[in-house]
A protein has these predicted regions:
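Residue-level marker for well-ordered alpha-helical positions
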Residues: 17-20, 99
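Hydrophobic alpha-helical segments, principally membrane-spanning helices and signal/leader peptides
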Residues: 22, 37-38
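Generic hydrophobic/aromatic pocket-lining and core-packing "Φ" positions
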Residues: 22-23, 102
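Aromatic pocket-lining residues of Rossmann-like dinucleotide-binding sites
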Residues: 26
Length: 118
């Protein structure tokens, strides 16, 4: 078995959407990043290729986002799916920050499709 040594600041195991975003953020912050993925090339990216919806706050329709999804509606949806068990301060911070995720993902080559209809 061949052994290699890598000098890295951040080690990420797995190459799904969250892992790839974490790797990009760490690299943008100046860290040396090593991402390990065992999936064959055709399967890399985890479930990202099957993801149909992106949940991010937006106050008006924007290209593929056909309706507004304001902070309060997002918060109420979060309360429903968590049964009300959530930290409001932290949740609202994440909800507000989600408004920039689409442009950040686009900057890194993610392509979005319009919603399905029918």
């Amino acid at each position: 078995m061949k052994t290699e040594a890598f000098d890295t600041d951040v080690l990420i195991i797995g190459g799904g959407n969250a892992a790839l975003c974490a790797a990009l953020m760490a690299r943008e912050a100046g860290s040396r990043v090593l991402l390990l993925e065992s999936a064959p090339r055709a399967w890399r990216g985890g479930n990202s290729s099957h993801t149909r919806n992106l949940r991010c706050m937006h106050d008006a329709p924007q290209d593929v986002l056909v309706e507004a999804y304001p902070e309060e509606e997002y918060w109420q949806d979060l309360l429903k799916v968590t049964g009300g068990i959530t930290n409001e301060h932290l949740a609202r911070m994440v909800i507000r920050a989600s408004s920039t995720c689409r442009s950040w993902m686009r900057k890194h080559g993610v392509h979005f499709q319009p919603p399905l209809s029918g």
